[in-house]
């Protein structure tokens, strides 16, 4: 599949920001932009905001998701939330394996793999996050780390399973600190991710799967990242909290999508 045939997906990850009122106000203000954009716009909101935001934007093209879920359907897991709960609240997708979950809460690939399987089982689109730390990058381990994360997090899945899964490459060293991978460097890793998918599954699936980039994305680097042939979207943290900034990035995404389409 040509890169221009893959959808462009811009995802905002609000992390632990925005009250229900703030989230609803933001989402409603974003709708005029989303409705006319040629790309897909997703937001991973706090758990408390999933249902009210979904009600606020009912029947719109804006896609709402969760930032995490447990691999169990239910049980005595204080403070946890099940995938079926966030889906019932209105989530269409879920972020899994985000670096903050891996490093702050010690989630490993096996646990993330179980979450991915559960998400697929209940009809949530998993956005699988992978990426290396500064130390791993410095020691030349980037590709091995990425390979291991993808292989172990997707273990036991079929090609059919992956048709609704997104991969997000987020170099840990570039998250939330103003640093970001150079577009060419990010492209190299995205291309490598497709190579792994080809080895495990098929060339067809490798060309179809959407791979996002995340890591200090902002209006000054969004276009240069999205111009890369294997970067199909962006996973945005801090820059997604400002309506003005997020709209600018969404509009940039639409421009690049249209540009790539003309090259067919």
Swiss-Prot record:
GO molecular function, one term: triose-phosphate isomerase activity
One of the Pfam families matching this protein, by short name: TIM
Subcellular location: Cytoplasm
Family annotation (InterPro entries): Aldolase_TIM, TIM_sf, TrioseP_Isoase_bac/euk, Triosephosphate_isomerase
Keyword set includes Cytoplasm: yes
Keyword Isomerase recorded: yes
Catalytic activity, reaction form: D-glyceraldehyde 3-phosphate = dihydroxyacetone phosphate
Coiled coil: none
Pathway: Carbohydrate biosynthesis; gluconeogenesis; Carbohydrate degradation; glycolysis; D-glyceraldehyde 3-phosphate from glycerone phosphate: step 1/1
PROSITE patterns assigned: TIM_2
Role played: Involved in the gluconeogenesis. Catalyzes stereospecifically the conversion of dihydroxyacetone phosphate (DHAP) to D-glyceraldehyde-3-phosphate (G3P).
Family in the record: Belongs to the triosephosphate isomerase family.
Protein name: Triosephosphate isomerase
Gene that specifies this protein: tpiA
């Amino acid at each position: 599949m040509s890169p221009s045939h893959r959808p462009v997906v811009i995802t905002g990850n609000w992390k632990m920001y925005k009250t229900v009122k703030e989230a609803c106000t933001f989402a409603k203000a974003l709708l005029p932009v989303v409705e006319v954009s040629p790309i897909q716009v997703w937001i991973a909101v706090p758990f408390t905001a999933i249902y009210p935001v979904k009600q606020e934007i009912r029947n719109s093209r804006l896609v709402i998701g969760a930032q995490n879920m447990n691999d169990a359907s239910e049980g005595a897991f204080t403070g946890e939330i099940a995938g079926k709960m966030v889906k019932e609240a209105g989530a269409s997708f879920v972020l899994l394996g985000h670096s903050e979950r891996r490093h702050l809460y010690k989630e490993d690939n096996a646990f993330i793999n179980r979450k991915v399987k559960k998400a697929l089982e209940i009809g949530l689109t998993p956005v699988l996050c992978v990426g290396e730390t500064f130390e791993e990058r410095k020691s030349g381990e980037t590709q091995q780390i990425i390979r291991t994360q993808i292989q172990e997090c997707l273990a036991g899945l079929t090609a059919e399973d992956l048709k609704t899964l997104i991969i997000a490459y987020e170099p840990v060293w570039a998250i939330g600190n103003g640093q970001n991978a150079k577009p060419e460097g990010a492209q190299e890793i995205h291309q490598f991710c497709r190579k792994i998918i080809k080895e495990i599954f098929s060339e067809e699936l490798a060309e179809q799967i959407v791979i996002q980039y995340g890591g200090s994305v902002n209006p000054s680097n969004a276009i240069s990242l999205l111009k890369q042939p294997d970067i199909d979207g962006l996973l945005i943290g801090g820059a997604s909290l400002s309506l003005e900034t997020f709209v600018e990035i969404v509009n940039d995404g639409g421009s690049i999508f249209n540009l790539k389409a003309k090259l067919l």
